[in-house]
Amino acid sequence: MTSEVQTPECELFELELLGGGMERRYRRARPEVEAMPWGTLDPRPFSEAVLVAARRSWTSAAFQEHRTAAACAATLRALISARAPLDLIAGFARFPLDEVVHVELCARMAMELGGGTELWHEPSALCADADPSLSPLLQATELVTRNFCVGEALSIPLLHGTWLRATHPLPRAILGRIVRDEAAHGIFGWTFLDWALPLLPASGPSLIRRTAELTIAEIHKLWAEVRRRPPLAPSDGHALGWMGSEEYLQLAARSLQTRVLTPLRDRGIQLSSAFTSGP
């Protein structure tokens, strides 16, 4: 989580590369990072207000991808503890690396615009763990529901919509790379549930419903923050890689219905009406 008030637990969100052999192996594993058209974006045509908003947006995106990497790592451990099918685990195992790549892409995009903005966070609250009193299978179910059936499933159409609207080659290439990686993330939750549901105890569907509702409640809070943002000219936003607030919220509402609520209903999970409406 981020914090506007700096408490003793808060740390500045900063990133670094170790370099040397570790970086070379990383570059060989994911050469697409260096293949981006870095250095092609001239920030001078944009107003200071637009640039600051863009830097803040991409810094926040880097932090959110950092959080998602932590959530992926926690979910991977839960899948292994639950003895999920080996091919399911193997397919998932690349997701943490995908997210680390996305962290670097977003952070470097912020640097292209003049540098990241100050962001304080509590490392101990980076991502939520599963309820330790649950069985390994139910812990995995809780994390997959939160992070993939809701979180990743909802984020992918929003990323895709932003990619479609990005007009400059650099943010368009970055968003395109993220969208391609996230395609597998978006379907994983449903693949897992199709395997796990027949194995879950009677309390399993209720756990899925409660977890989805709590996650959507947090997303509704984020949407309320988006609604309060001052509007920027759509052309400016599109060039640097984001949507206007109203456009974003409309797409978010549609995506919640089609990418989250409908697949849950198809599997017999019906959420309370308070969680089925858009922003």
Named regions from a protein language model:
Residues 1-279:
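Non-heme di-metal
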